[in-house]
Amino acid sequence: MKLSDFDFDLPSELIAQYPSRERDNSDLLIAVTPPIKTKFYNIIDYLKEGDLLVFNNSKVIKAKLNLGENITINLNQKLSDDSWSAFAKPARKLHVNDEFYFDNHKVIITEKLAMGEIKVKFELNDISVFEFLNKYGEMPLPVYIRRSHSLCHPVATTTGSKTYLNNDWIPWSNHGMTNTQNDNDRYQTVYSQIEGSVAAPTAGLHFTKDILDKLKAEGIQATFLTLHVGAGTFLPVKTENIHEHKMHTEYCSITPDTAKIINKAKQEGKRIIAVGTTTLRTLESSCNNGIVKAGSFKTDIFITPGFKFQTADMLLTNFHFPKSTLFMLICAFAGFKEMHELYKYAIKEAMRFFSYGDATLLCRK
């Protein structure tokens, strides 16, 4: 298939610049015929006793560092205890062996690669890299969140001949809060545990502890795996032949207990619901002859139409970029034609896209 097959027109005003007022107050689109638009807090109405939700419990680290002189780096992947790959902006201002000081701690540029990628080493005094980042770093919000732009403060969205009031989301300043304070909270799932992601597994951002408690009370199970989301998740596909695209690699882990829970549910005919594309990619990467294997590994799995799924029956996910690997994934999961039609409906209904946007619940075709 061609890259252009996965294109669609997305009005820029539908790119969410802020999350909804409350986590579970975002919209949820149920992919049935015709589609059902509801609120996320109603998700329990579309699940049933015995269902198994599989979550990604990776925790977003404060991976963005300001080096001064308008230079920033965004960490990408851990290479060793003190070394990381990163993306620099602008990379041309950096040189190998450049040193940057944060009080009595030091960050050293050790290698320059292509496309703005670099390698850095941390020389720290009595603290870990994660402790250093918690003190000096910032949440690595995606580049399409541009709050200095006029899009930051909309009171309504116009799509075609229709205008929709955005009463459920407003800038942080209207709450008497700062961007930093609230992104630290809202760009993180309530169940995150294991530090390592440099972008949020966004499908999980809608869940509250109250919803998780209600799901448990209804006999809906939950289990957790880990995929540390890398910055490569935002890299565009540049080849018209999609199969020439080289996927980024990401670290994954599935515990023996989690694998046992998933395999037992499958054997009993229970529905497996992957919360997010990161969860689905981890499950499919670990699966052999229908059995999910425990272990820690790296994956560069690239899921496109024609892929034979072995694990999840349903997928909860946000709305994705045109021509992105994630839109290709959902077309593979729920149908190429069906997803194009669903996205047309979502755009007509002025649903919000990307990390801080709305969610959709898909059934495997």
Curated annotation (Swiss-Prot):
Pathway: tRNA modification; tRNA-queuosine biosynthesis. This is S-adenosylmethionine:tRNA ribosyltransferase-isomerase. Transfers and isomerizes the ribose moiety from AdoMet to the 7-aminomethyl group of 7-deazaguanine (preQ1-tRNA) to give epoxyqueuosine (oQ-tRNA). Transmembrane segments: none annotated. The lineage of its organism: Bacteria, Pseudomonadati, Pseudomonadota, Alphaproteobacteria, Rickettsiales. GO terms for biological process: queuosine biosynthetic process; tRNA wobble guanine modification. It is found in: Cytoplasm. Keywords: Cytoplasm, Queuosine biosynthesis, S-adenosyl-L-methionine, Transferase. GO terms for molecular function: S-adenosylmethionine:tRNA ribosyltransferase-isomerase activity. It comes from Rickettsia africae (strain ESF-5). InterPro entries: QueA (IPR003699), QueA_dom1 (IPR042118), QueA_dom2 (IPR042119), QueA_sf (IPR036100).
